[in-house]
């Protein structure tokens, strides 16, 4: 798949999104910052990437996901948990960054902060019904299938 990428900050030419390994599903996104930013515990900020994408095809979307090491080691996750980039969005990719840890965290310019994953999308059309065909589960919700 070819993906249109617009470089909004010339410094990002040296830090284009890349797959870390041949098996990677996510492209690393970096913080496009002029200076380090300190996030206090509980603080959230929007971090620019200096990049924009345009998927164009409504059969695809992009997800911005946290990097596992930052969340596990430092408590740095996404403020919106998952960022959804629709196929027709053309603005700068921004990363909502939340320090849920107990200590301050310093985010340095061009540090890898999140990952971008391209996923297929199916746009559903509703079929209005009075009742559903019966299933084994029915309307059983939270915990209805047992604990073990």
Swiss-Prot record:
Its EC number is 3.6.1.23. Pfam families: dUTPase. Belongs to the dUTPase family. Substrate binds at residues 67-69, 80, 84-86, 94. It comes from the Bacteria. InterPro entries: dUTPase (IPR008181), dUTPase-like (IPR029054), dUTPase-like_sf (IPR036157), dUTPase_trimeric (IPR033704). This enzyme is involved in nucleotide metabolism: it produces dUMP, the immediate precursor of thymidine nucleotides and it decreases the intracellular concentration of dUTP so that uracil cannot be incorporated into DNA. Its cofactor is Mg(2+). Pathway: Pyrimidine metabolism; dUMP biosynthesis; dUMP from dCTP (dUTP route): step 2/2. Keywords: Hydrolase, Magnesium, Metal-binding, Nucleotide metabolism. One of its GO terms (molecular function) is dUTP diphosphatase activity. This is Deoxyuridine 5'-triphosphate nucleotidohydrolase.
